[in-house]
Amino acid sequence: MSGSTRPARARRTARRVVSLDRISPTWRDVQGYAAQVPATGAKLAPAFPHAARPEGAEAQWVSWRGDVVECAVWWGPLVETAGRTATVLRPGSDAMTLTESDAEGADPPLESLGALGGYLYEPDRAVIRAGLTGALARLVGGAELDDGVGYVSAAAPLDVPWAHRYTVVEAMPWNVKAVRGWLRSRGVGRLTIKKRGVSLEPEAVRRQLRLSGSSEATVALTRVAGQTVAVMVDPAW
């Protein structure tokens, strides 16, 4: 006997609901059903909290073309690997799944901005949601910039199907005047702003920088050792 359930998300007009108390049927009911049925699966929102995964179950974050579409929780014989997993789906490619064991033994996050390597990697969002960025750090021989930000620094280039790679051009502590000066000196007027792990809003940053040149650039706003930094990069993969 097996079963599946897709709890409805509570309606909110302002922001996404992440509380399991707001879904229907309730998370308690879903777990109760799973305790009675040998094989159960539940499809939940990508914001499913890691700590809510039942003992022995598999919480699988799934992405399609880089966007996380769901977190599926599996019980009993439907479990392929207990714990947190990430499955990446892309057109024309086989599904790729990472597990917690793939991330074990990763180096700790960078201790300073000076330790930043020549390449910045950004894993698929399912990998980040599942908390498995360490798998990328291990693969490329690098380290996450700060705990939980999702960016990985490494010294060497490596093509990873489930990650984007950027060449680091410059990096500095976040300071509007300093970043504006660096960009203006290179005639940058069109700026792609990426961010992870910081509260800065890209459009507000764009207004503060007041750029007017004809060149293009990309900046990643993130954290290193708890400090907000700006990393200027060129897309490489």
Regions found by a protein language model. Name each.
Residues 1-237:
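SAM-dependent transferase fold signal centered on methyltransferase-like domains
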